[in-house]
């Protein structure tokens, strides 16, 4: 179920303050965040945000095609390494 259009998109206040501070200084700096549920808004375009995936922070460069998506969509949490090999030969 999607968020109601009457409400604004969710962005963590701390993350929003960091973005606004960097926009006023016109500096580019990596922003570290744990807020995977935050929605990407147009003021974030051009910044690099390091998103936590449960183990480490993955730096993601925000471009205009990412607006409207959540930050967590770009930092996968699971690492699929393939199915286990069947060891039928060892049983014979």
Swiss-Prot record:
InterPro entries: Ribosomal_uS19 (IPR002222), Ribosomal_uS19_bac-type (IPR005732), Ribosomal_uS19_CS (IPR020934), Ribosomal_uS19_SF (IPR023575)
Pfam families reported in the protein's UniProt record: Ribosomal_S19 (PF00203)
GO MF entries: rRNA binding; structural constituent of ribosome
Subcellular location: Plastid, Chloroplast
Gene3D superfamilies: 30s Ribosomal Protein S19, Chain A
GO annotation (BP), single: translation
Residues making up the signal peptide according to the UniProt record: none
Keywords, alphabetical: Chloroplast, Plastid, Ribonucleoprotein, Ribosomal protein, RNA-binding, rRNA-binding
Any Gene Ontology CC annotation: chloroplast
Purpose of the protein: Protein S19 forms a complex with S13 that binds strongly to the 16S ribosomal RNA.
PANTHER family registered for this protein in UniProt: RIBOSOMAL PROTEIN S19P FAMILY MEMBER, SMALL RIBOSOMAL SUBUNIT PROTEIN US19M
NCBIfam families: rpsS_bact
HAMAP family: Ribosomal_uS19
Membership in a protein family: Belongs to the universal ribosomal protein uS19 family.
Protein name: Small ribosomal subunit protein uS19c
Gene source species: Panax ginseng (Korean ginseng)
Gene: rps19
């Amino acid at each position: 179920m999607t968020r109601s259009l009457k409400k604004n998109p969710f962005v963590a206040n701390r993350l929003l303050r960091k973005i606004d501070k960097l926009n006023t200084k016109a500096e580019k700096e990596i922003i570290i965040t744990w807020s995977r549920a935050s929605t990407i808004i147009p003021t974030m375009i051009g910044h690099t945000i390091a998103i936590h995936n449960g183990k480490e922070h993955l730096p993601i460069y925000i471009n205009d095609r990412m607006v409207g998506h959540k930050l967590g969509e770009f930092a996968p949490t699971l690492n699929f390494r393939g199915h286990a090999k069947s060891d039928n030969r060892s049983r014979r």
